[in-house]
Regions:
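Short amphipathic alpha-helix that is part of the acyltransferase structural core
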Residues: 1-21
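Short, high-confidence coil segments that cap the C-terminus of an alpha-helix
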Residues: 29, 84-85
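Short beta-strand micro-motifs in enzyme catalytic cores
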Residues: 30-32, 54, 121-127
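Conserved beta-strand in the GNAT
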Residues: 33, 38-48, 55
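Conserved acetyl-CoA binding element of GNAT-fold acetyltransferases
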Residues: 49-63, 91
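Conserved catalytic-core motifs of GNAT/GCN5-like acyltransferases
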Residues: 91, 109-125
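Conserved beta-strand-loop-alpha-helix junction that forms the acyl-donor binding cleft
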Residues: 89-101, 117-118
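Conserved acetyl-CoA-binding loop-helix of GNAT-fold acetyltransferases
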Residues: 65-81, 101, 105
């Protein structure tokens, strides 16, 4: 199992996603390792799902979740500086409240909920922001 799968399959991360199915490495994604004060704490990643549209996600171990906002904002700065992304999306299962709060905390706007999105069981709330909305959020906050 590679490091990405090790994080994605950590019991505390599985508990909040995909009905406990775990995570498989996807070669089409661009992954970034997260370290806080020298300690490995998780992964952030994106996948270009449409031209210039990135589906973005984070998998943090519990001990670094207190830094999640700073990590998320640094990730936005990185992709805005190093790519031409025009839209970002993300989603969080209804049962994973931390994921929903995280999306709002880093400047994404709630788009809506799709019922039974994960395996016909879990409802999932989707979030998005344009490049301009992210830049404005980074410059001014809410």
């Amino acid at each position: 199992m590679n490091g990405i799968e090790a994080v994605g399959n950590h019991p505390d991360i599985i508990a909040g996603s995909n009905n406990g199915d775990g995570y498989d490495y996807k070669p089409e994604c661009r992954y970034f390792e997260v370290n806080v004060h020298g300690q490995f704490g998780g992964i952030v990643y994106y996948q270009e799902i449409q031209p210039l549209t990135f589906d973005c996600h984070a998998m943090y171990l519990p001990e670094i979740r207190g830094f999640s906002k700073e990590i998320g904002l640094a990730f936005w700065r990185y992709i805005l500086t190093n790519t031409t992304v025009q839209c970002v999306t993300s989603f969080a299962a209804r049962k994973f409240r931390h994921g929903q709060m995280y999306c709002a905390m880093i400047g994404l706007k709630r788009v809506g909920t799709i019922k039974k999105y994960f395996k016909g069981v879990d409802d999932v709330t989707f979030y998005s922001a344009t490049r301009e909305e992210l830049i404005d959020f980074l410059n001014h906050g809410r």
